[in-house]
Structure formats: structure tokens, C-alpha cells
A protein has these predicted regions:
Chain B
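Alpha-helical interface subdomain recognition
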Residues: 1-75, 170-320
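FAD-binding core of flavoproteins
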Residues: 77-185, 310-320
Length: 381, 320
């Protein structure tokens, strides 16, 4: 039993910090802004990481990866999140679209999609949620009706992050009425966002631009070549995707950085603020360790809902705890963004976004349900 | 990163678990509470025969050190009535002169099981003035302190006990993790069995919520205990690391015990139920040397003095 991530992983951390210090502008506030110049930074970061073979370090070598250890991969995710995700919206392609296409794609699909993802040149969005299918994703109903050798898509997706800037959509549609299980009859399509009949409508939200959008399909045509995996058996693919997403973002990494900055404030050495701060430090360490447990279990092929969702629960609650602590510590001075190189200058943005931590990618209630179910079945079998 | 306990360590712990189960599990704690002589008569021989009390929980031998903390965890799982953690907190080099270490905050009037360890010392949670502990008679039971023994702190001991805070804290954390693991398992099993309104109570959202919170707390403590133990074995655990674990131990116990009781309803309050016994018997472990507020203050003082290791480490503060 030992917890060191290893020399290579720590060396990678140092290298990434140097690289980001060099590439990120002074007042870097993350890529999710209207400003084209800001998004250009994300593109530059991705392409630089790609040149240095760091963008897809966890991919197998045959797809341009460096076959990095799971801990190097963890370090990469931690450093990216801690620095406000300088890869921008590309991270989805890297973290799950690419691996899913490797697993389920045809040779042609792999050739078409993997190189641009690995090169940091493409943005994907995830078209799963619908107005009537949120937590209950299996009840999704966006229709794909037969039309000659293809299908016509009609219906709506919602909450689709980055849809306005996405090149491709990873779309779940219903090709058949559910028989038996309601998840039967779902098919995954890889749809270019410029296909006729696809429209995006941004939703004005407290999170800021790009995060939430509506996505309409009005007779957009897809063919067998656009299908990922098997027709009507898309739920298999969705399960694989959710499996990749389930350990989730290493939120504790940014929280660690924010806590380190908070500890430098006047007043952090004592009083109620000091006590809350050290408690949050303990919670951040716990969240990191639970996440490491889940990563190790996934690597060993023994990950269950218990490890995946306890890690998520700890991390998302930490995110909200630290965001509140930061905004309250700053008081009225923190309500408006003050910019600068420190995370604390973006405390209000972090606070707004933290409202979604317990909702996005499966709500905390669903995580709790999964953990409880895992435990009760462990005790009854 | 290697998150596996060695096979040898696991085997030794399994042997002890079987032996403890043979003594009745939590029933042994019940029996000892009714008659403290049970501790020496029934538990001591098992601890002797398995060699648990001679192990070095922080030494270079991974099998032995792992076996020691897993043994502590197994004892905690049934709140075995013996000061195992106090004995193992003594560094091997000091065992010729010292039988047990109690970490104290100020001058305690009582310590648990102090009558069982002849040459015990008291080490302050902050500072290094080590005193001998003299037990004044046998246990005088209180509901939340079943083996409390009146003590007097006597003459100063010349040699300090290095790393006492870290060792004691890590061992207490494993003990508590064992107890909380038992409670979590009991609650999950009960939720699946107990039916109300025609359904298992595990199908109610509120009960699932509680069980999930218990799992996060108990599993988190398991991880942090092992992590801090690993730091301590490398000689890298600071007092802040130890106190962070202590804060997590107290927090986890609060979440698990409160929610555990709620899942059981009235039956969990009965003395014949293991939950009630584990809850009461764990309390002294959680409150000595200090309660949650004071422990957090001690942590803050250490973080100010030495900083705190993290992905973005907290720097020490200039405290005048
Ligand atoms: C920032 C953000 C980005 C997102 N990006 C995307 C994206 O890119 N693509 C995409 O497809 N989706 C995306 N989502 C959608 C996200 O997956 C859903 O919001 C989530 O699955 C919950 O669905 P819902 O919002 O419809 O809430 P609902 O499912 O309607 O839930 C409302 C409340 O009811 C609770 N609830 C529901 N069912 C149960 C139950 N069985 N037991 C107990 N409580 C229950 C929920 O926990 C929640 O508290 C995003 C969401 C957010 C916030």
C-alpha cells in the first residue's frame, strides 16, 4: 500500500505547469467566454500539447497516444482543471469521444475522427439530454425515422454544452420503439453540426456563455455510415461513455489551488474562516484520495458504482464548499470579477459554475442512489 | 501507487478476525463492560497468541506494518476491549521501558483501559513533556466511556516518545474505520431487509441518501488512514497531516453513526443491537485527547506553523 504517483507523473506535473505558465495569458479566466482571442488561446494550447505528444498521452500508441500510465493521465487532467481547462471544449473529444470511437467505431470512422481529435482541431458536443429525459436518460425520444437507406432526425436535445462552437455532435436518437427494456431502440449517430436541419439556440444562463444550449433536429438526414456501434443497441455505447465520464472531472485540483490562495488572505490564520479553511483542506484531500481509489479500480478493471460515485459525491460537494468559502471570504470585493492571474479573481465565476456541480453528468441524487444500491446489494448477496 | 495490502498482511488480519468472531465479536465488548476481568481472561490470550501487540505498525517491513494496521482495523470492527492502539503507538525502540502511549491534551482525569498497561506514558498533543501514567483502580463505567479508569500523571519521563501523535492518530483512525465499516455494512444490510409500506426501506430515497453519505464518510476515512500511514512510514507525516486525519476521523464517525442510527430506527438504540454498543464504545476514541472543535483549532495552528501538503501546497504563515 503506497500512494506516490511516481516520478514520471510528478515530472509531467512540473512540465505542464511550466508549459501553462508560458502559454496562458496573465489574466486567463478560462476558455468559456465570447471573446475570440480567449478561444484562440485554447486552440494554441491544444495544438502545442499535441505537438509535444501530451494531448492524447493516455491513448494507445496506435492512435497517436503515448501509452502513458493512468497516473500521468490523472496528472494531466488535474493540471488542466486546476488551470481552468485551457484545452477548452476539446477536452470532451479527448477524454471520451476518441476512446469511444476506438472501441465501437469502424475502421473508416477511426480514420476520419481520431486524427483531428488527437490534433486538438475539433470540438464535439454531447447530444444526450432532452427536455423530458434528464436523469431518466433511457426514456430519450428524439426520433430517427427510416428514410430509404438512412434516417431522418426530428426532435430536440437540450443542455448541450459547446454546441455553438462544436463541429460534431455525439447524438443519441431513438430508431425503434423500446421493446422490453426502455433502453432498447437507441442508436448513436455521429452528426456534423453543419448538416442541413441542425440548429443551435444558446440558452442564457447564470453559468455564462456556451455551457447550456438547445439543439434542434428538423429532418436532418443520417445514414448507416454515421452510426456508431449497432443500430438499436446504442445503450451499450452510452454506458461506455458514462463509464468514462463517471469518475468525472478532478475538481479537487482546482479547489486545492483556490484553497492555497485563500490561505494567503488576511484572517485565514484564525477565527471561523481559518477553521473552515482547514476543514476544507481535509475534505479536498479526502476527495482526491477517493478519486485515486476509483482511478486505480478502473485501471484494474474492478470499478463499481461504490467507488465511482463516492468519488464523485466527495468532489462535487467539495467544489460547492470551496466556492462558497471563497466568495464569503472575499465578501463584497468578490462579487464582481477582478481578473488577474489568481484564481481568486474569478471566485464569482467559480461560484456560479459550482451551482451546477451537483447536477451535470448525473445529479448527486443519482450518485447517491447508485452508491446505496451497490452497498445494499453487497450486503444481501 | 499501489493500493493493495500484501497477502501476508491480509492473512494475518483474517486470522485475527476469525479469532475475534470466535470470542463473540461485539458480544465480547458487552461482556467486558459487564465484567472488566473478561478483557484479560478472554481477549488477552488471543492477542498474545496472534502476536498482534508485538507488531511494528510503522516499520520498513510492509507485511508486518500492514498486518498491524489491519489488525487494529479488525479490532475496531468489533470494538475489542483492549487498548491495542495505545500499545502499538509505542515505537519498538521504546518498548523496553514503555507499555502504552496516551496522547493527552492538558491533564486528563481518566483514560480508557489504563489499568491494563503497567508502564504507560502520557504525551501531550502539542509539546513534548512526557509523564508517567498511574492508574487509580479499575474501570468505573460510564455509558459513553465504558472502560474509564481514573489516572494520575506522575513524574516527568526523561526521553520523549518520537512521533507519538502521528502513530496514535493513525492507529485510532484505523480502529475507527473498522467500527464505521461495521456500522455501514449493518445499515446497508438492514435497509435491504427491513420492509415498511410493503417495500424494503432501501427503496426510499431518504434512506439511500443516508447510506450513500455513510459510504462516502467511511470509505474516505479508509483512504485517508492508509494515506497518512504511508506518509508516516516514510517519515513524511507532519503534525498537520496527523491532525487532518484526526479531524476526518471525528467527522466520519459523526456522519456514519448519526445516519446509521436513523436507518435502524428504534431497534438500533437497544443494547442487544451491535450499533448501540459500537456507538458508545467508540466515543472515547473520538473524544480523547480532544473533541472536534479543539482538534480543528490544533490543526489550524499546525497548518499555520508548517503549511499543508496538497497539489497546490499551503505555505506556512508567519505567526508572531
Ligand atoms: C452545466 C451543465 C452541462 C451539461 N452538459 C450536457 C451536455 O453537454 N449534454 C447533455 O446531454 N446533457 C448535459 N447536461 C445535462 C445533465 O446531464 C442533466 O442536467 C442531468 O442529467 C439531470 O437532468 P435534469 O437537469 O433534467 O434534471 P432532472 O432529471 O429533471 O432532475 C431534477 C431533480 O430531480 C431529481 N431526481 C430525478 N430522478 C430522481 C430519482 N430517481 N430519485 C431521486 N431524485 C431524482 C434530480 O436529482 C434533480 O435533483 C448538462 C447539465 C449541466 C448542468
Amino acid at each position: 500500500m503506497e500512494f506516490e504517483l511516481g516520478e514520471q507523473a510528478e515530472a509531467l506535473r512540473t512540465r505542464l505547469r511550466e508549459l501553462l505558465a508560458e502559454m496562458l495569458p496573465e489574466n486567463w479566466a478560462g476558455p468559456f467566454s465570447d471573446d475570440e482571442r480567449v478561444r484562440a488561446v485554447a486552440d494554441r494550447v491544444c495544438q502545442r500539447l499535441a505537438r509535444e505528444r501530451l494531448l492524447t498521452i493516455d491513448w494507445p500508441a496506435e492512435y497517436g497516444g503515448a501509452g502513458a500510465s493512468v497516473w500521468e493521465q490523472t496528472v494531466l487532467r488535474e493540471e488542466m482543471w486546476a488551470h481552468l481547462e485551457p484545452r477548452g471544449a476539446q477536452y470532451m473529444g479527448l477524454s471520451w469521444v476518441g476512446p469511444t470511437i476506438m472501441r465501437f467505431g469502424t475502421e473508416e470512422q477511426r480514420r476520419e475522427h481520431l486524427p483531428p481529435i488527437a490534433g486538438g482541431r475539433v470540438v464535439w458536443c454531447q447530444g444526450f439530454s432532452e427536455p423530458e429525459a434528464g436523469s431518466d436518460l433511457g426514456s430519450l425520444s428524439l426520433g430517427a425515422t427510416r428514410d430509404g437507406d438512412g434516417w431522418l432526425l426530428s426532435g430536440q436535445k437540450i443542455w448541450t454544452s459547446y454546441a455553438p462552437i462544436a463541429d460534431w455532435c455525439f447524438l443519441a436518437a431513438r430508431t425503434a420503439r423500446a421493446e422490453g427494456a426502455k433502453t432498447h431502440g437507441v442508436t448513436i449517430f455521429l452528426v456534423p453540426m453543419d448538416r442541413p436541419g441542425v440548429t443551435v439556440r444558446p440558452i442564457d444562463s447564470m453559468l455564462g456563455v456556451l455551457h447550456l444550449n438547445e439543439l434542434y433536429f428538423d429532418g436532418a438526414r443520417v445514414t448507416g455510415a454515421d452510426v456508431l456501434g449497432t443500430v438499436d443497441h446504442g445503450w451499450e455505447v452510452i454506458k461506455f461513455v458514462l463509464g468514462h465520464e463517471r469518475i468525472g472531472i478532478p475538481r479537487y485540483a482546482r479547489d486545492d489551488r483556490l484553497l492555497a490562495e485563500l490561505s494567503g488572505l488576511d484572517g485565514a490564520g484564525g477565527g471561523a474562516f481559518g477553521l473552515e479553511l482547514v476543514r476544507a483542506l481535509v475534505h479536498a484531500r479526502l476527495a482526491r484520495l477517493l478519486s485515486y481509489r476509483a482511478v486505480a479500480r478502473r485501471e484494474a478493471g474492478t470499478l463499481t458504482d461504490r467507488e465511482a460515485s463516492t468519488a464523485r459525491m466527495a468532489a462535487i460537494q467539495l467544489d460547492q464548499e470551496v466556492a462558497s468559502l471563497a466568495l464569503n471570504a472575499l465578501g463584497p470585493n468578490g462579487i464582481a470579477p477582478s481578473g488577474g492571474g489568481e484564481l481568486l479573481g474569478h471566485a464569482e465565476d467559480i461560484y456560479r459554475y459550482a451551482r451546477s456541480a451537483t447536477i451535470a453528468s448525473g445529479t448527486i441524487e443519482i450518485q447517491r442512489m447508485l452508491v446505496a444500491r451497490a452497498l445494499t446489494s453487497e450486503e444481501t448477496t | 501507487m499501489n493500493r493493495a495490502w500484501t497477502a501476508t498482511a491480509q492473512e494475518m488480519a483474517a486470522t485475527l478476525r476469525t479469532a475475534l468472531a470466535g470470542l463473540g465479536g461485539v458480544d465480547l465488548a458487552r461482556a467486558a463492560e459487564a465484567d472488566p476481568a473478561v478483557r484479560a481472561a478472554r481477549l488477552a490470550p488471543v492477542l498474545d497468541s496472534t502476536g498482534v501487540l508485538d507488531l511494528d505498525a510503522f516499520g520498513a517491513d510492509g507485511d508486518e506494518a500492514g498486518a498491524a494496521v489491519l489488525a487494529v482495523r479488525a479490532c475496531g470492527a468489533v470494538v475489542a476491549p483492549w487498548p491495542v492502539t495505545r500499545v502499538l503507538a509505542v515505537p519498538p525502540a521504546a518498548r523496553a521501558e514503555v507499555d502504552a502511549v496516551f496522547v493527552v491534551d492538558g491533564t486528563p482525569t481518566h483514560l480508557d483501559h489504563a489499568d491494563l498497561v503497567g508502564r504507560a506514558v502520557a504525551v501531550p498533543v502539542a509539546g513534548d513533556r512526557v509523564h508517567r501514567v498511574r492508574a487509580l483502580g479499575g474501570p468505573k463505567r460510564a455509558p459513553l466511556d465504558p472502560f474509564r479508569v481514573a489516572v494520575a500523571l506522575e513524574s516527568l519521563v526523561a526521553a520523549p516518545v518520537p512521533g507519538a501523535l502521528t502513530r496514535a492518530t493513525v492507529l485510532d483512525a484505523f480502529w475507527t474505520a473498522g467500527a464505521l465499516g461495521s456500522v455501514t455494512r449493518l445499515a446497508a444490510g438492514y435497509a435491504a431487509d427491513r420492509r415498511q409500506f410493503g417495500r424494503p426501506i432501501a427503496s426510499f430515497g431518504e434512506i439511500r441518501w443516508r447510506i450513500a453519505d455513510m459510504a462516502v464518510a467511511a470509505d474516505g476515512l479508509d483512504e485517508l488512514s492508509a494515506y497518512t500511514w504511508d506518509l508516516a512510514r516514510r517519515g513524511r507525516a507532519t503534525p498537520a497531516d496527523a491532525l487532518a486525519l484526526r479531524v476526518a476521523t471525528q467527522d466520519a464517525a459523526d456522519v456514519v453513526l448519526r445516519n446509521g442510527h436513523q436507518v435502524f430506527g428504534a431497534i438500533g438504540l437497544c443494547e442487544e443491537h451491535d450499533l448501540a454498543v459500537i456507538d458508545r464504545h467508540l466515543t472515547p476514541v473520538l473524544l480523547r485527547p480532544a473533541g472536534a472543535q479543539r482538534t480543528t483549532e490544533l490543526l489550524l495552528a499546525e497548518v499555520n506553523r508548517h503549511g499543508f501538503d496538497a497539489l497546490f501546497p499551503v505555505a506556512p504563515r508567519d505567526v508572531g
